[in-house]
Amino acid sequence: MYDYILNALVKIEAYLDNESDSVEIPNNLFKTDILVDYYYYPGHFVDVDDDEKELIAATLTDAGYADHYDALAELLWKANIEPIPKEELVDGNSYCFIMISFGITPVQAHLKAKKAKYEQVTFFCLPYTDREGEQRFKILVVPNTFGSIFKEMKCACLLDIESEEQLDKTYWSLLERAIGQICQTLSIDVTGFALSDTTYQQKTLETYSPYLTQFCQLTQIQNIEGFKARWLEIQQQQKQLIQQVKDEGFYGTVKPAFLNYRFLLCEFLTSTYEDHWQMDYDALFDYLAKYLEQPFELDEEDGLQPNDIARKVEAESNYSLLDIETRLESYCFLPCLKTDVESILNLAEILDFPMSKLGD
C-alpha cells in the first residue's frame, strides 16, 4: 500500500549518504520546516568531543538507558529488526537510520480536546534487508515528544503498514506528504506522490527598496536601479529560476539565498574575489594588495585558511573580509571597511543574502 513511500526512502538515504547528513526542507505543508537527519551508529554518538559525551550520557540516563547501543537495539526490536551485535559495530561498520520531524496542527484526540495549536511529529525510518535481498524500511512514529533523540527512541511506536486505525492512517498521510516534499526539493526522481507547488514568500520592492539602496551604497554597487530591478525579477520568477539551476545540475535544496547569489550578487558585486576551492593564493594576495593599496603576504606557517587570511587583513588594514556562501565548490570574498561590517551583515540578513564575516 505504501511501497512508493518506502522506495522513495531508499533514494533519500542515498542522497543523505552522499550529499549531506542533515537538511532542512522549507514548505507550505506544515507548521515548520521538515528536518531530515541521517544518523550513523556508533559514529554519531562516540566520535564527539568531551562536552558532547557528557551531554549524551546525561540524556541517555534521562531516557532510561545505560548505553546508546541499548537505545538503538530497543528501537530496532520495536520494528522487528534484529540488531547487529554491538561487538560487530566497529572499524567503520555502522547501522544508519533516518529521522524526519516537523510541526503540525494536532491530530491526536487529547491534544485537540485541549485546543492545542501545535504537535511535533517525528518518524524513525529504519532500513533492513528483506528475504529477497532488497533494502526496505520500517517506520516508527514519535507523537508529540520533546527532548533528546534517546527520549524519542524510547517513545517511538511501530507504524504498521497494514493498520486500519485512523490515527495511523493520518500519520502515514503526513509522512507521505513530507517525503514527497523532500524528494521534490532535493530533485530526487520518484513516482506516486502528489507534489505541491512550493515557492517562497515574495518580498515587495516597496518594502525592501531602502535596504537595497543602503546595501548598494555600502558595497560600492554603482547601478542601484539595475540591482533593484534584478532583485525584483528574482522575487517574481523564483519557480523558473529554481528549475533553471536544477537543470544546470545543482543538486540540493535551492533556497532564496542561493538565487540571490547566483542571479544578483554574482553580477553586481564587481569588487569580490572568486576562486575554485583549490585556491590560487598568489592571485588572492595580489587582489588583496591592490584592494588594500598596500603589500599583502601570508606565510604558510601563519595559516592559509580563509579565517587566517581575514585576520591578517584586519590586523594590517581598516578592512574586514566577508564570505559569500556560493554553495558551489568555490570561494567568494568581499572586503569592506571594518566600520561597515555590522550594517552590511544586518542588511544581508534582511535581504536573504548569504554573507558572513571571516576571521572571528
From Swiss-Prot:
Classification via InterPro entries: DUF7821
Organism domain of life: Bacteria
Protein family (similarity comment): To P.multocida PM1082.
Name this polypeptide is given: Uncharacterized protein PM0657
Annotated organism of origin: Pasteurella multocida (strain Pm70)
